[in-house]
Amino acid sequence: MITNVSIKNYKSVVDVSLPLGRFNLLIGANGCGKSNILEGIAMGAAASSDKLDYEYFANRGIRVVDPRFMLPAFDDIKSDRISIGFTNGDNSLATFDIFYNKDTKPAHWQDESVSADSFVAYVGENLSLHGRMVKDMIERINKMKSNKNNSQLQNLRLKPIEDDVRIMTVDADLNRFLIYSLEETILRKADDSNRTYPLGRHGEGLFAYLKELSQKTEGEEIFNEIKENLKVLDWFDDMQVPSGQLSMEFNLKLKDSYLAETLNTFDQRSTNEGFLYLLFYLTLVISDETPKFFAIENIDTAFNPKLCREVMKMLIALAKKHDKQIIATTHNPAILDGLDLSDNEQKLMVVQRSVDGYTKVRTLNNKDIVKSDLPLSQLWLRGFIGGLPNNF
């Protein structure tokens, strides 16, 4: 798991260090730089994959603009280099120094960092399968070492190998980093027009992927876990993928517990948007084919305030269970009430602009919270933790 991200000279983010946990929530006023932070991480992920091109940017959630606007536009900042660094515990995974090379035809973004870290990143991407094989081998050897009869294995040192495998695995997760920003019109479409398998950043491919899961033996457990968690919605009774669909048909059969037996099923075209958003997030977190490390913009969209709290608790628990790492943004105070800041794996970060306009980040913990019986949502609304406009 990535434990820290440093971003320098990306748009309004001049110099920010972001300590990460399992679930990380960014709050702040409109225009404070929350999306810029997410894009900076995506920029580093693009560099780690050696895919610094505009098509890749768009598919990963980076807003494609004139290269001049990818760099800070402050009078006192003259750097033409974007620097993105990633850390896993005590290990520096990689640091990428990215610049726009105008001397080539066509001009393009380029990573000029050549280091052992970036080499490890390359190895991690291309040998992730071997990494898993070595990891399995290490586990088996450790079991053999525990047997005192295997005296020849007692002094075998595996720690350096274990560290390398861990770095390779984490870096492979970084390469798939994606910023999800759902759109109802796209989410509701029943097609498979998706450039990022299995789920697109706006909601593409959801029904095609659920159909695929329903047709695989190993997908049944995932499908059932998704259904079980959908029961947080009081009306939800069941969800099935109808048999006999044509290859290009992608429909769901949903059952409402309140409706009469003669008319209690319908497809996704008739359901509410909150259900669709929740279905997508559950699929994203539970599936083992989706990215391990990703971001969600405006995670509160389409949810009732009370549901926001329960969805947060649910997604955090599922992220721990399925080894996912999530960064989310919100403007809805109710989302904060699903956080438990006594858990070090849950982070609340306040994003704001400095007097010079730079984006800065402050991580809150229990010691920073005013002693009060008020929930976090009310502490935010009343201005005790920041993250609000201060010009009115």
Model-identified regions with their sequence ranges:
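Well-ordered beta-strand positions in beta-sheet-rich domains
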Residues: 15-20, 93-97, 265-267, 360
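Conserved P-loop NTP-binding catalytic core
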Residues: 39-104
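Electropositive, glycine-dotted interaction segments
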Residues: 81-241
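Pre-Walker A-like glycine/lysine-rich segment at the N-terminus of P-loop NTPase domains
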Residues: 1-64
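Conserved ABC ATPase signature
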Residues: 231, 235-306
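Short loop/turn elements that form and flank the Walker-type P-loop nucleotide-binding site
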Residues: 1, 14, 19-21, 289-290, ...
